[in-house]
Amino acid sequence: MDDILFVKADGDYIHIHKADGDTLMTLMTLKALERQLPFDHFCRTHRSYLVNVDKVEGLKDGKNRIGGKRIPLSDSCKATFFEILSHKSVVLKAQS
């Protein structure tokens, strides 16, 4: 679980992106996986993305950066995302 950077939905499949660069694809919905993961470590940032908040590196232009990739942060998910980050005392730097 700690090696998961983020998960991207693709219909009824999900792509699990790991810290070692591997990507796993499995037949499961993002919602089903979200229910199985600890809510204080994983947060929905967009209808198609679930991120490991411990791996967030920064924010720029409404997107967060994880593992060198820019992940969308939708308006409807911002409040929950920042709430979880505030409880974890995560300090984000602006990306240029």
Predicted feature locations:
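Conserved binding/recognition cores within well-folded domains
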Residues: 1-73
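DNA major-groove recognition helices of helix-turn-helix
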Residues: 33, 80-81
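C-terminal structural segments of small proteins and small subunits
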Residues: 72-75, 79-80
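Short, charged, intrinsically disordered terminal tails
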Residues: 83-96
